[in-house]
């Protein structure tokens, strides 16, 4: 039987020692949204709940300030 092992998910913010997620760091926030503009869930990214909440708030704030788009395109 062939078995495959998934890579263990880890929280990038805990590993790097980041305390607060900044809404102005657009390059980092883009890693956590899909091409359609949706926030990627923590079960996919491996982010801890504390940082997932901060990430969600930062993305929503960046969207409100027009730093990130709400959707990919409007048709």
Curated annotation (Swiss-Prot):
CC terms in the record's Gene Ontology section: cytosolic small ribosomal subunit
Transmembrane segments: none
Keyword ATP-binding: no
Domain of life: Bacteria
One Gene Ontology term of the molecular function aspect: small ribosomal subunit rRNA binding
Keyword DNA damage: no
InterPro entries in UniProt: Ribosomal_bS18 (IPR001648), Ribosomal_bS18_CS (IPR018275), Ribosomal_bS18_sf (IPR036870)
Keywords: Ribonucleoprotein, Ribosomal protein, RNA-binding, rRNA-binding
Pfam families recorded: Ribosomal_S18
Matching NCBIfam families: S18
Function: Binds as a heterodimer with protein bS6 to the central domain of the 16S rRNA, where it helps stabilize the platform of the 30S subunit.
Assembly: Part of the 30S ribosomal subunit. Forms a tight heterodimer with protein bS6.
Similarity field: Belongs to the bacterial ribosomal protein bS18 family.
Full protein name: Small ribosomal subunit protein bS18
Lineage, broadest ranks: Bacteria, Pseudomonadati, Pseudomonadota, Gammaproteobacteria, Enterobacterales
């Amino acid at each position: 039987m062939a078995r495959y092992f998934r890579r263990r998910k880890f929280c990038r913010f805990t590993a790097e020692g980041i305390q607060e997620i900044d809404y102005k760091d657009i390059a980092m926030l883009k890693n956590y949204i899909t091409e359609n503009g949706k926030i990627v869930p923590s079960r996919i990214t491996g982010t801890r709940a504390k940082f997932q909440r901060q990430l969600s708030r930062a993305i929503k704030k960046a969207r409100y300030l027009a730093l990130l788009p709400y959707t990919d395109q409007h048709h």
